[in-house]
């Protein structure tokens, strides 16, 4: 079995169906003795250029280990699913299990937002001198 990295771009109007689609694809891989090494839902993101007048898409990343027949079946499902506007399949030499750079950046951004404190609204006058 070989290792593959799959990226799906799902139509933004179908974002609520992403979970069901992902579960169906995971089940297909696992039923054919494959393994899911990494699954990341990157959410809705701006496209670099419009695809069929669509400017945003919901991104999903998979790293799987499967055989050629299962991969061909997955690609066929991607091709005939109208909700998927683009798909990319890359063969990898090894299983990739670590978090992607995009996910790491998102985690760091969330951590920074959580640690930054909003200024107190009572202290908005910028005058720290007491005038008596």
UniProtKB/Swiss-Prot annotation:
Highest taxon, organism lineage: Bacteria
Gene Ontology molecular function: any one: structural constituent of ribosome
Pfam families xref list: Ribosomal_S6
GO biological process: translation
GO cellular component terms, semicolon-separated: cytosolic small ribosomal subunit
Biased composition range(s): Acidic residues: 122-132
UniProt keyword terms in alphabetical order: Ribonucleoprotein, Ribosomal protein, RNA-binding, rRNA-binding
UniProt-annotated stretches for the region Disordered: 94-132
Stored InterPro entries: Ribosomal_bS6, Ribosomal_bS6_CS, Ribosomal_bS6_sf, Ribosomal_S6_plastid/chlpt, Transl_elong_EF1B/ribsomal_bS6
Coiled coil: none
Record-linked NCBIfam families: S6
HAMAP family on file: Ribosomal_bS6
Family statement drawn from the similarity comment of this UniProt entry: Belongs to the bacterial ribosomal protein bS6 family.
Role of this protein: Binds together with bS18 to 16S ribosomal RNA.
PANTHER family documented for this protein: MITOCHONDRIAL 28S RIBOSOMAL PROTEIN S6 (PTHR21011), SMALL RIBOSOMAL SUBUNIT PROTEIN BS6M (PTHR21011:SF1)
Protein's name in the database: Small ribosomal subunit protein bS6
UniProt organism field: Psychrobacter arcticus (strain DSM 17307 / VKM B-2377 / 273-4)
């Amino acid at each position: 079995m070989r290792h593959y990295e799959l990226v799906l771009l799902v139509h933004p109007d179908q974002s609520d169906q992403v979970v069901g689609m992902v579960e169906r694809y995971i089940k297909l891989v696992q039923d054919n003795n494959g393994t899911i090494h990494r699954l990341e839902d990157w959410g809705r993101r701006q496209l670099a250029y419009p695809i069929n007048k669509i400017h945003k898409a919901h991104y999903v990343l998979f790293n799987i280990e499967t055989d050629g027949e299962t991969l061909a079946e997955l690609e066929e499902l991607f091709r005939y699913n109208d909700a998927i506007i683009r798909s990319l399949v890359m063969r990898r030499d090894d299983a990739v299990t670590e978090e992607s750079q995009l996910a790491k950046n998102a985690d760091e951004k969330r951590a920074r937002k959580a640690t930054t404190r909003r200024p107190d609204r009572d202290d908005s006058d910028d005058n720290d001198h007491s005038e008596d």
